[in-house]
Amino acid sequence: METVYFNGKFITKEEVKISPDDRGFLFADGVYEVVRWYQGFFYDLNGHMTRLKRSLRELRINWTDTDSFPDFAEKLIKINSLENQTAMVYLQVTRGAARRSHNFPKPDVLPTVYAYAWGFLPEVKLKETGIKAMLKEDIRWSRCDIKSVALLPNTLSFQEAHENGLKECIFVRNGLITEGSHSNIFFVINGTLYTHPESNYVLSGITRKNILRIAEDCGIKIREEAVEENRLRFVQEAFISNTSAEVMPVTELGGNTIGDGVPGPVTRIISDKFDNEINSLKG
Ligand code: PDD
């Protein structure tokens, strides 16, 4: 039986009751985080906590128990017997339930907090072959830096990719490549690693941040600079990053083969270093 966390309690999923007046349901008025458990620890939980607090602050959601997340996330892993597996924890915090009105509830209502854990098998094979992705105009709002649950542009775009047998949809805003529907994207051009700078047009991925640190440690030249769509023909390598896929090579983008159509050397170095770091943390 699956045990989840709901408003301070560990209960079965069936026991969860969320009001139809919940602003998460009515307005997508909430934030989320996804953290990964590597058979014994959460990777960069501090990074996720910092981003969670920032998202809550930006939406002015006052969840006073934010610091309880690391503890109940680990409890969720243990209660569901996932300690020795690769697993994820999803957390969602909404502004809470109040009669539908565009202004925030006055006085404040308690936020609704829901989290659950699940085990999964990493996509090892895809890392060897790389993935194909589509390109599409970035139809999202201009606060992509907030990890909000308002993900309709992302899900619509990802669905389009999925229906075309592609593994991600990469967005282009004003001719510049921003990020994917649920990932950041990196390019290698003449040995330099490019990714969109932190801004309101991309989510500051925790994996992105750690990849930049690892690449710097390896002496790889880095430019946090958006790549123009029309420079794609000069790109030798591409990869996406997120908590579940880590470093995932992209071998075809928008119908164009990237480099030799196989994961490139810089991608491999970064991916291997990332794996090494995880293994050393496993101890
Ligand atoms: N998504 N950009 C977007 C739009 C994302 O949704 C995500 C993650 C990322 C990568 O962030 P991180 O490295 O912190 O996972 C970038 C998660 C995995 C999701 O929505 O399930």
Name these PLM-found stretches.
Residues 205-210:
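Feature captures the catalytic cores and cofactor-binding loops of soluble hydro-lyases/lyases
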Residues 176-198, 204:
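Glycine- and Gly-Pro-enriched alpha-helical subdomains that act as flexible
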Residues 1-169, 173-176, 199, 212-283:
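Conserved alpha/beta cores of soluble small-molecule-handling proteins
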